[in-house]
Amino acid sequence: MLTGEDNLRRYDVAILGGGPAGAAVALSLRKHAPSLAVAIFESSNYDEPRIGETLPPTVQPLLAQLGVWESFLAENHLPAYGTQSAWGGDELESNEFIYGKFGRGWHLDRRRFDAMLAREAEMRGVDLFTASTVAKPQKPHDGRWRLTVRSKDNQSFSVAANFVVDATGKRASFATRQGAQKILFDQLLGAFVFLKCGATTADSCTLVEAAEDGWWYSALLPGSGIVAAWMSDADIVRRHRLKDANRWFEQMQKTVHTKHRLLPAEPLNKPELHAAYSHRLDRVTGDRWLAVGDAAMAFDPLSSQGVFKALRSGILASYAICDFFKGDSSGLEKYQSLAAREFDGYLKTRAEFYGQERRWPDSPFWQRRHEQVVLQKE
């Protein structure tokens, strides 16, 4: 950290958000540009539960590139040996990870995973501020961003940064304040319930099952837990009143496979609604800033690409930032172009996958997935 006048901290790069994308930027910068002063500002203490995710085996090279592969293995996340899906028909089909190049995947404890990445960045010299929010970004005449940072105990200080990374997730709070517009491609929500497993829940596969008004997801969690979600559009979620536990379980009992996995389990909470819509920013870079991870673009959970995309995005962003500090702005242009191409490819894959399910032609949920994508600016 570089100090300046009273109550002002100076950094080359200020990263707003300490999730996988923000941490990946920091870790990669420490590797490729160790002279840069870098700070992460994270709103949480990494102590609240976070929705889990199945991490594909292909993440191994990214974690190794960031220098955290051994630390990741030491966390002992639950193994995931593949995915089972009932999609386009009632019969389950399996995709076994173990036959691929990198073997098994993992059911992530996201809280521990995110905290591990941030801790590794801090150990490498990144300043980590937790329970801290950033407000009032201002760009004064000297070209540096000025940020006001507040902790949860109401202490505040100012930060001067030559470059800002928006890693604030779907909110994209910094980028949107700079005029970037969020373009929505659907209104997908997840109604999530955490459950305590029964003794019969022994398989470690992620289970995906299509239903008339959406689709179901379930995966194991540490400590004999399981997370399950009913995924549908916001208007359908409201119509079915899925925040009501009884209504959620009524829908779950209409499934063919998910109910057999969940009925032995005991719910630990009422359904929680979380945004899962696909979106992108109309631009992911600007004057001395860029957006990474879900702040730049977010994929449908069906892709199982959330954390993988976040890490890859963070690494690519770090290359663009390194070029910027060498006086070369073309890296930011390349980053913008790569992001656009990646999202175009995702939309094609998304359309192909949803197009495989044709059992409910009169369902609004499936009709929307089979129609041409209509862009919506938020």
Regions inferred by a protein language model and the residue ranges of each:
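Helix-loop-beta segment of a Rossmann-like dinucleotide-binding subdomain
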Residues: 91-109, 146, 231-235
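Predominantly flavin-linked oxidoreductase catalytic cores and closely associated redox partners
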Residues: 120-258
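N-terminal FAD cofactor-binding segment of flavoenzymes
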Residues: 48-84
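Short beta-strand to alpha-helix junction loop
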Residues: 99-120, 238-243
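FAD/FMN-dependent oxidoreductases across multiple families
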Residues: 75, 236-317, 329-333
